[in-house]
Amino acid sequence: MSAGIGESRTELLTWLNGLLNLNYKKIEECGTGAAYCQIMDSIYGDLPMNRVKFNATAEYEFQTNYKILQSCFSRHGIEKTVYVDKLIRCKFQDNLEFLQWLKKHWIRHKDESVYDPDARRKYRPIITNNSATKPRTVSNPTTAKRSSSTGTGSAMSGGLATRHSSLGINGSRKTSVTQGQLVAIQAELTKSQETIGSLNEEIEQYKGTVSTLEIEREFYFNKLRDIEILVHTTQDLINEGVYKFNDETITGHGNGNGGALLRFVKKVESILYATAEGFEMNDGEDELNDKNLGEHGTVPNQGGYANSNGEVNGNEGSNHDVIMQNDEGEVGVSNNLIIDEETF
C-alpha cells in the first residue's frame, strides 16, 4: 500500500470516500475538520463523533471539529502540529498535505478490524475483538465449576442455566433499547448545540447594533446639550446687560427691530424642550445630566459656544455663528438670525 505522500488528489479522495463512505468532490471540503476527525476515529475508535459537525458552515463549527481532533492527538501522544488557521480557510495545498500525512499515519496504525463509518457518525460504539471475547472468558470458569458438582447440583445448575439464558436474552434486549435511546438523545443534543450556536451569533450581532446606537445617541445628545448651553448662556448675557446694543433690540420695546435675539433664543429653547405625545421625562436621567454638568463645568462642547467660565466664543467649531465678537471685544448679533415667525 502506498504511504500516501505524493499521491494525487484523485487517489486521496477515492481512499477517503471509500473509508468513510462520503461523497467529497474536492480536497478543500476536508477543511471543515470533520473528515479528519473520523479518519482518526477509524484508527482509535474513541472520538465523540456525535459532536463532530459534518454539515458545518460557520467558522466556530470548524473550530469545534479541530478541538476534538487536537484532543485525540494529545490523548494518544501524537506529535503533529495542526495549523488550524490555515486548514479552516479550505485551501487546496494546506489540506492536501495534511490529508497525505493522515493517510500515512492511518496506514501505520490501523488494525484489521472492520470500521462502520455510518454507524459511528450516529455514535454507535465500536465492538472490538477484545470486547467480543470477554463474555466467553467469564463464562468458562462458571461452566467448569458447575460440571464438577453432584447430581443434585447438576439439576440445580440446569435450572440456573435456564434462568441465566433467559436473563441474557432480556439483558441484550434492554441494552439495544438503551442504545436506541442514546442515539436519539445524542441527535437531539447535537441539534440543540446547533441552535445555541445560531443564537449566540444573533446575540453578537445585536450587541454590535446596540453599541453603534449608543455611540450615535451620545453624539447627538452632546450636540443638543451644546445648543442648550448656548441658549442659557445667551439669555444670561442678555439679562446681565453684557450686550452693548440698544434696549429696544433686546427687550422688544419701542419701534426698533424688537427683541430679535431674545425671540430667537426662546424659539430654540421651546424646540429643545418640546416632547412627543405620551413621552415622559426621566427624572433620574435629568439628575445624572445635571450632575455631569456640575462636575465638568459644562458638557463637552463640540460647537465651541461656551467655555468653562461661561464666556461665549462664536468663532470656534460652528459654520453658523449666532453670537459674534468684534476686534474691540464688543458682542453683536449675527445677521444670520432666523426671526421669521412662519419659520417656526
Curated annotation (Swiss-Prot):
GO terms for molecular function: microtubule plus-end binding. Residues 6-107 form the Calponin-homology (CH) domain. The modification N-acetylserine is found at residue 2. Residues 188-281 form the EB1 C-terminal domain. Keywords: Acetylation, Cell cycle, Cell division, Cytoplasm, Cytoskeleton, Microtubule, Mitosis, Phosphoprotein. The modification Phosphoserine is found at residue 157. Coiled coil: none annotated. Disulfide bonds: none annotated. It comes from the Eukaryota. GO terms for cellular component: cytoplasmic microtubule; microtubule organizing center; microtubule plus-end; mitotic spindle; spindle midzone; spindle pole. The keyword Cell cycle applies. SUPFAM superfamilies: Calponin-homology domain, CH-domain, EB1 dimerisation domain-like. One of its GO terms (biological process) is microtubule depolymerization. Present with 3630 molecules/cell in log phase SD medium. This is Protein BIM1.
